[in-house]
Structures are given as structure tokens and as C-alpha cells.
Amino acid sequence: MGSQGSGGVPLVQAPYTVLLLPLGTSRQDPGAQSFFLWLRRMQALEREQDALWQGLELLQHGQAWFEDHLREAQRQQLHLGALGENFLTDLHSEPGRPPLAQIQKVNICLQNLIHEKELSRQQKGVTQPKEEMAQRGCTKGPRGPTRV
């Protein structure tokens, strides 16, 4: 979608149109000030949308990463369960795996971000219907069993 930024984070670039209108009035004109403030707010909203699209893309990559690591952890658990008490003969560390504390830290950051957004919605009196959340895949459904 875009080039890679620092740290491998994809950069989202959207086309912008510059609009120059000669107003023929002074800066103190209420109409000119109103238009300028409107235009500035529109630009801020465009930048916010760009950041949100980039965040959504990062979340999709993050979801795939979590799913891959979850499958790998389940595979290792099945393998260890199959070894039984002979697991000491098959001790090999996985150096490429992130530490549990790091995964938990990311989970807490995501949870805090989502929780803050939900609190602000509740304070504004805006709540999402359960049907809408289910359509987006945001349900808190049961997790799969852990096999040993």
C-alpha cells in the first residue's frame, strides 16, 4: 500500500488536493475565517483517517502474527504432551520466540487503547449495538481448548 518507514512500518500515502481560492477579503472577514477553520479541520480529519487506516493495517498484520504464534505454541504443547516424561531428551530452546512478558505488555497496551475508546463512547452516550460488534468480529466468544 505504501513504502516502508522506520522499523518496517508501512507508510500510507494518500493523494491530497490543494485548493487555493482568492477570497478577495481581509483575514478579519468572518466568512474567510470560517472557511479557513473549516479547511484546517478537514485536513486534520484526513490526517486522522490516514493514521487510522495505517493502524488498521498494522492490526491486521498483528492479528496474523498472534495467530501464527498461537498455532506454534499449540503445536509445541502437543509435541511436549506426546513426549510425556521423556521431554528432557528433546530440550531445544526457541531463540526466535518473543518473551511472554513482551507479549503480555503488547496485550495490555491494546486492551488499554480499546478500553479508553469504549469509556469515551459511554461518556458521550454512544454505545455500539451487539449486532454491529458481532458483524465486525469483535465478539468475546469462547476460546479454543488447550490440548495437552
Curated annotation (Swiss-Prot):
Q: Which domain of life is it from?
A: Eukaryota
Give the start-end ranges of region Disordered.
120-148
Cited Pfam families? Suppressor_APC (PF11414)
Q: Which organism is it from?
A: Homo sapiens
Q: What is the protein name given in its UniProt record? A: Suppressor APC domain-containing protein 1
What InterPro entries does its record include?
Suppressor_APCD_1/2
